[in-house]
Amino acid sequence: MVKKKEESGHSPLVNKKAKFNFELISFLEAGIVLSGSEVKSLRDKKGNLTDAFAKIKNGEVFLENFSIAPYKNGGYANHPEIRPRKLLLHKKEIEKLERQVKEKGLVLVATKVYFKNNLRVKVEIAVGKPKKLHDKRDDLQKKDAQQEIARALKSSNRYQ
């Protein structure tokens, strides 16, 4: 009997700018409605999440600005590169997100797209608060300080 693989062989698409531009508060996994050529293109890692965000319209959540390159062998059945893609969430989850976005002025940001059990495409969305310029500068200074400390510790351990 062949063992099933737990982890997918595909590395996820990650939005690296999300942590820099937003203070991420909570995360949520959602399914996404895609066409066949979009799934094949994502398996080839041809997606871009940099400017992707989610919007709630009429009780449904849509992922905007998520760019998936056309599949190279798609032919006439290829998909448009950028279009609103529906996210699959339970009604209570959508209502909770809608309350957070309306009351607290938070935004929904796509942070990761990955394959679950090598079959289904999932999107990790985060509820976040946009950072101001001085917050970004503070984060960069903290990161630089941590790197200096790590570098100093590494060099001091080298000579012992």
UniProtKB/Swiss-Prot annotation:
GO terms for cellular component: cytosol. It holds the Pfam family SmpB. CDD domains: SmpB (cd09294). It is found in: Cytoplasm. PROSITE patterns: SSRP. Its main location: cytoplasm. GO terms for biological process: trans-translation. It comes from the Bacteria. Keywords: Cytoplasm, RNA-binding. GO terms for molecular function: RNA binding. Disulfide bonds: none annotated. Belongs to the SmpB family. Required for rescue of stalled ribosomes mediated by trans-translation. Binds to transfer-messenger RNA (tmRNA), required for stable association of tmRNA with ribosomes. tmRNA and SmpB together mimic tRNA shape, replacing the anticodon stem-loop with SmpB. tmRNA is encoded by the ssrA gene; the 2 termini fold to resemble tRNA(Ala) and it encodes a 'tag peptide', a short internal open reading frame. During trans-translation Ala-aminoacylated tmRNA acts like a tRNA, entering the A-site of stalled ribosomes, displacing the stalled mRNA. NCBIfam families: PRK05422.1, smpB. This is SsrA-binding protein. It comes from Leptospira interrogans serogroup Icterohaemorrhagiae serovar copenhageni (strain Fiocruz L1-130).
